[in-house]
Amino acid sequence: MPPPPSQKPGQASISAFFKPKSSQRPITKSCQPDRAQVSNGYARTSNLLDTDTGASSSAQPPHKRSKLNNKDGPRRETIDRMSKWKFTALQPSDNVSSELDEAASQATPTERSQHDQARHDAFRKTLLGPNFAIDRHASNQMQIDDMSSAHTFSHSESRTSTGTKVDAMVVDDDDDDDDNQHEQAAQSVPGTWNRFTGLAAPESTPAPCSHRDSSMNKTKGKPKASGAGTGPSYTPLEKQILELKAEHPGVLLIIEVGYKLKFYGEDARIASKELSIMCFPERNLLTAMIPVHRLHIHVKRLIQAGHKVGVVRQIETRALKAASKNAYTPFVRKLTALYTASTWVDDLSSLDDLAANMGDAYTNQPKSLMAIVEQSERGNAQADRVSIGIVSVEVNTGHLTYDQFSDGHARSELETRIAHLAPAEVLIPPQLTKPTEKVISYLLGNGADGGVRIERLAAMPDYNQAFQSVTRFYRDRGLESPEVPEVPEVPGSSEADTTRLATTLADGADKRSSPLISLIVSLPQLSLIALAQIIQHLQAFQLESICTLSTNFRSFSSRTTMLLNSNTLANLEIFRTANEQTERGSLIWLLDKCKSAMGRRLLRKWVSRPLTDIDKLQERLDAVEALRDGKSYVLRRLDSVLHGLPDLERGLARMTYGRATPTELATVLLSLNRVTQEFKADEAATWKTQSSLIDTHLLSLASGKQVVQTYLNQISIKEARANNKADLYLDADVFPAIQASKDNMAIIDGELREHLREIRKLLHRPSLDYVSVAGVDYLVEVRVADAKKVPVEWLRVSATKSMVRFHTPEVMRLSKIRDQHKETLDAAAQEAFARFVRELCKSEYVVLRNVVASLAVLDVLLSLAHVARAAGYTRPVFLRQPQDAEASVPVEIIGMRHAILEVVSAMPYIPNDVSLSTGDSGAAILLSGCNMGGKSSVVRALGLVIIMAQIGSFVAADVARIGVHDAVYVRMGARDRMFSGRSTYMVEVSETADILGSLTSRSMVILDELGRGTSSRDGYCLAAGVLEYLLTLGCPPNTVFITHYLQLASMQRRYPHLRNMHMAFTSNSRNLLDPIHLVYKLRPGIAHSFGIHAAHLARLPLQIIHSASTISSALYAKHTNRSAFLVLKHAFANPPQLATVSTLQHLLFTHPPT
């Protein structure tokens, strides 16, 4: 075959490795000389196919080798050519021919044929391109089926996973870099010369087979040809992977291998199932791969499934590795990132959807990490009563919440905190009490099924150990003043000794320590133990820095806020509806008009924790009213200022963790600069906002102006948006290591330019310049006709129909040095950027955090102002009462409406008037009436008005005059907890007991149909007992008691502060089947339930309706006769003068017919 036009006579190319079978002479493994030893009589070529008929490119390491673009498979003539041709050697140079001949004489025919086949398979892959992997895929499927019994990997799973179009990857037959290094290291002993590796293979080892055959043999566990052993022989890479798995048990590892991210072993099987990707055997381990650019997407999916995911990176760079003494050993790999659902920190480019899977549907807030510690209360009469300490961290926002509380058998207090804090991961001690275990299991589920991930700690430290661990953590970070003595570690010290020491430190902390240390040493004991567990856990994720900022700490229990328990959140549909379990139709859906992510998160905190401080409530209401009216020009600009802001709270958190990119840093600083420039402190006198709260937060925005501009002036915004860390800083002297690396690269660039002048002279082309193709730089491109003029020592990289591209030896040498300087520059730039962000957060975090917090507050106030503009909303008027006075809270609401129903319902809502604990009304209402008459709707509207008023919102009423409540307790509905072993009645009674144990005279209590979960007799007795208990308290709370037990109405005679009321209706007949008309208005007195009417409307069969009506009439007559008999008996048992009409009326009222 004639040589191609671009090939110089005597110049080597890939075509020279082929020869027809008829003219082929026997060859040996050592038939090819080392490239470094080839004389100048032979030009060097790349490993890819030279062609003049189409574009072809080659990527030199560290770039990945490209393949031929064979979309329709190899052409027929190419396949025919492969069947006719075999490999033969280039003629070696004279100086090595004698050595090669000697080695050839020592090779056996079997070794020669095996080596020929290995070379044949390698070049066949190069010729056929990606379609060569098809046959291997078929064999891989057979191997997976064979290994399924050992790995529990079913055939159906593998078949399903290969159907994924987005993430399923074609198996690449290219050897991994580490595997190539393994083969080179194994063959770098005296022996014959190998054409493909450039190294000699030992004569004592068998001839190497193709990668395909080697993979299959190792996967099936077949012994080597030499019979050295019967078990699997692990490569250095596989040994490294097994060591990593042993070091990190329970972690699903994603390992960087070359330019790929891979799962191995059982992790590959799990990833194949969870991600719907292909799993295939590779040597001794199952393997699955994902694209590098979709790492964050797949990590999210895995952690949402409840897995703990680790990312193992190569910490050595290619250029520096090649220049080191360990060039032929595996890359050093370490766990560089660890993720769970609670520790995942999204970047600013991700969509801010708080209702997505990474948030919680119950509270629509970011998931948190919670540590729970409990301790039995000694000396308590109830053996199952415990003290519980918790610490919860939201890593996306930096908020850290702590609390310690006493809880009963039902663990309702723990349930309330879980509902508010919405943990995605919970750390618990090795053992908990059975009631606590049941509550956690019922509420949090199983992480493996997509629920909350529960991690049980190996051991729980006592207070002594926890205190020493926490104080050491803060002392090591320089957060403790030198005057504060170090906590000694006394092996025999008791918990009481450490407690006394902690108390001593706390007493003097205000004068000698930072505010953070003062807070830490004053934490409750169980909370401190939980904090120690949180810090230790976060250190593995490199997120512990969030615990070093005092502004992030807050107590869950506060005297200035109202605590809504989990039942109230569910029954009043605060965050989600009861039926659809969606946000639409909930209170948060009605109020959320925020424009920023920070504002939406803060609004949820306001709604879940209404204020009890009347002065703060007045401040909020003044601000909402001012924003609603919009009289000030400053207030009218707020809406445009807040529009389009990124999630600055999350951005600051990423900066604190050291995970922010230059683009995110620029985004945060530019957004803060735009906000702080909008309001100037020296113009505050002209704002006239009529709200001290708004003025305070506007001044807070202005206070961050100088800080933001200082750091903005140090960086280049253009380079930051391009994520260019090397050219990010305007002052090059700030980070000299960067400039030194740049200078070294500039020297190499100068030598490359000087070498280019030499090439121009050699080729007589004054305008010649380097070109870059497919990621390969510094290519010398010449026309095909001139290709024969280039020196033979140039390396031919790629060719097209018209052009041929080369690398000169000097270019390759200088490129290697330049790559080393480039990687040094990248490392220096990374360290400089981390230092820049670290110093920014250390010195100015509080200022920037205050600016972001003020933006969130203004956003929430604007949202409430938008709600206040709706028709029929009024500003609530709070009635002041002495804080220490034991008195019921007055409530007077005129024209009260259900704020949500009037929006979602097509029918107009009927308003009602409610008054409690006022001069003309008592503290309790006994509410009866028809089924579907609107009883539950009225009490829900009452609860919503109180909550909306105490978060600082206008309310849906004509007039609202209320006092400040410290809690709203709502018990409604019937439900069981089968998985926790609690029946409907047990749940009902337990929730009622929790309310009775927590209420005060300043609480609002709403009980709906108590006692329905058992027999009528027992239910009536329970309802009567609970109602009487509430009425006989020294200072009874405001109570609305819904019931169908009309006998309870008699209590009004004994307790004047109880009023009987019902939902009105109209009816023209006493026939149970005649229609009634519901009025939906509150009226004094009692009323029947009309349950048979409701059953008739529900379309029960008429036969059942008639039967029920007959039974009801009989029971009514029987009870009426018994009541009349009791009246007459009482009348004749007393003197005639007492048997007056009033006495008869009293007796009839005491025993009314039901």
Swiss-Prot record:
Keywords per UniProt: ATP-binding, DNA damage, DNA repair, DNA-binding, Nucleotide-binding, Nucleus
BP GO annotations: mismatch repair
Pfam family, any one: MutS_I
Residues given in the record as ATP binding sites: G929, C930, N931, M932, G933, G934, K935, S936
PROSITE patterns: DNA_MISMATCH_REPAIR_2
Top-rank taxon, per record: Eukaryota
Region (Mispair-binding domain): 228-342
Keyword Nucleus part of the UniProt annotation: yes
Region (Disordered): 1-119, 172-233
UniProt keyword Transcription, yes or no: no
SMART domains documented for this protein: MUTSac, MUTSd
InterPro entries linked to this entry: DNA_mismatch_repair_MutS-lik_N, DNA_mismatch_repair_MutS/MSH, DNA_mismatch_repair_MutS_C, DNA_mismatch_repair_MutS_clamp, DNA_mismatch_repair_MutS_core, DNA_mismatch_repair_MutS_N, DNA_mismatch_repair_MutS_sf, DNA_mmatch_repair_MutS_con_dom
Compositionally skewed regions (Polar residues) per UniProt: 21-60, 183-195
GO annotations of cellular component type: nucleus
Function, as annotated: Component of the post-replicative DNA mismatch repair system (MMR). Heterodimerizes with MSH2 to form MutS beta, which binds to DNA mismatches thereby initiating DNA repair. MSH3 provides substrate-binding and substrate specificity to the complex. When bound, the MutS beta heterodimer bends the DNA helix and shields approximately 20 base pairs. Acts mainly to repair insertion-deletion loops (IDLs) from 2 to 13 nucleotides in size, but can also repair base-base and single insertion-deletion mismatches that occur during replication.
Assembly, per entry: Heterodimer consisting of MSH2-MSH3 (MutS beta). Forms a ternary complex with MutL alpha (MLH1-PMS1).
Protein name per the record: DNA mismatch repair protein MSH3
This protein's encoding gene: MSH3
